[in-house]
């Protein structure tokens, strides 16, 4: 109940109440890795990245936590939000070592590669993703941007068309209609 309250309070931007609810959940569910994972995410989203990463590390080490790859991705997002892109990529790669085609880890790595100016690596990650996972607007957007950066207007147009037809109401489709390609 307290965990849910924390998530709801965060959603409605009642951060003090959210933090109090998360802390109650942590006390009541001492050692529960699912509660720890949620609270670690909250810590990261509220700028307490060091504490969040430390708690994610506890979650990852907990043998009762059945999806450590999720905690690795969450820790990577946390590290990146603190400006630690190299650490973030290490976490994403650890997630992929556990679950090789994990969509969120691949997307994160692809975005990081693109942001580093490695458009060919980003393109390759998009292709790997799409070979085994259902498309999302985010991955198609990354594919579009990577192909444009590489100068392949034909491949970029394929991604653009897919975004417009498969995800017409997405932020990415709206960006394309407005001429935004970042």
For every predicted segment, state its role.
Residues 3-4, 38, 72-74, 108-109, ...:
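Canonical tetratricopeptide repeat
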Residues 28-29, 62-64, 98, 131-133, ...:
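Structural marker of alpha-solenoid helical repeat scaffolds
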Residues 133-182:
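Terminal, low-structured helical/coil segments at or just beyond the last alpha-helical repeat
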Residues 11-12, 45-46, 78-82, 115-116, ...:
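Register position in tetratricopeptide repeats
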Residues 34, 67-70, 104, 138, ...:
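Start-of-helix register in tetratricopeptide repeats
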